[in-house]
Amino acid sequence: MKNNLHVFLGATVADAAARPLHWVYNQKKLNSYIKGKKDFTFLKKNKSPFYNIKTGKVSGYNEIGQVMFQTLLENYEDIEKEFKKNILKNFGPGSKYWKNLNLRSKYKKVKDWRGMIKGPWIHQNIIETVNNIKSNKKISGGVKVNESDGFCAALPYFLYGYDFKSLEKIIRIVTASKISLKYALAKFYIIDFALKGAKDPVHEFIKRFKKNTSFKVIVNDIKKIRRLNSKFHPITIKTVSYTHLTLPTTL
């Protein structure tokens, strides 16, 4: 399945394209940034209120996938072990990500301190993962937030052709949240259906898993999002529980 890596390439380009608008939660500001623009990908000027990196560079979500991809290219037998080493190397002490984490602690006393961060922003799941790996914990993934870091980390691994059972182990290296794990697996099933030629991969997921208790909430959320599909996006966001935004709002 290695020839399916075009999916990761597409995800990387999309991440870089949207990155200058990363985490712009203020709707009025967002509207002003994109006003009059037919194409607001790869904005030259950073608009993220949290951190500032050059246009063309990717966010931490894609970066963790890049670390996995590099681990796979190195062709180790024990991918899990080497992936953890590479996480420490790229995100842990001594890295630009960890340096900026320390600066965040320093700047927090300053109003609007987030805009002072020059360089990448390390995510909560990755902070926990780094600390847990250093502490030799059996399950290293973060548990404090329900985010998509685990999915992003496992995407290249999945596209290399590894099965769903081993996929869970990779996801748990970065996130141990039960909600994040379920949504990550759901996304992988949808991608799998798409790669196998399903006309409507999302509908195929609903059909296959509508009676599966593990995915019941996800199936219901997808149906809810599809009913709201014609609504103005901010209205949809407010309607759907924030906990479950990881998957359905993209459908």
Residues of each region from the PLM?
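Structured, active/binding-site neighborhoods that engage oxygen-rich ligands
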Residues: 1-245
